[in-house]
Amino acid sequence: MFRWFDVSYDVANTALIDDHRYIFVANHPFGALDGMMLADMLLRRWSDVGVIVNDLLMHIEPLRELWIPVNKYGRQHSAELYHQSMRSATKQLLTFPAGMCSRWVDGRVADLRWQTRFVKDAEYYNRLIVPIYVDGTLSSRFYNIYKVRRALGLSVNVELLLLVDELFRQRGTRVKIVVGRALDLRSMRGGVTECATLIRNEVYALRRFIPQQQAIHSAIADKIW
């Protein structure tokens, strides 16, 4: 699939112990592309991997075996599969707490508000959390449409209609991925919201390992209205 889209990725990572159970937590700059890349990265190390997604994505048949649906619409099967995966002794899990791809926020590309469920589940199911930073941007067109929509007070995410085209615009891209150290919630202070904020900060702190990262975002910033 990556060869067909002419995209690839490089990974800088810390040593992870294979027999731990992890929840990998990442930012979401591209949408589908980063999910596929991170799933591929994890499958190169572990044979049993699940990606936590909106249960509507279960209709994408080629990747269905990877998906772990969030019970967003009250579907009993989704809830059972989700908790079964969390309890699994072997399955490594990947989640994007923002639930949607990044937008232009405060002068740079960043996720919108993170959901905190991953913190509760990591604590309840005794999983370590591994922060991952994926470096990348969509086109300035995507972010400008988002800004215009917000300015007009429209609640419908019309910019999402561009995501397929944005995927093809990534042709020839080599994405940088940084995997951080595993975090144990037992060593973190604060409630669920505070822990989620700390972990989000850990994710974005990893971008310091990306050469010329600031230059990439500055080039996009020059085209934002």
Protein language model regions, located:
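A transmembrane-helix-recognition feature enriched in membrane-embedded lipid enzymes
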Residues: M1-F5
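Soluble catalytic domains of membrane acyltransferases
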Residues: S8-D184
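C-terminal/domain-terminus segments
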Residues: R186-W225
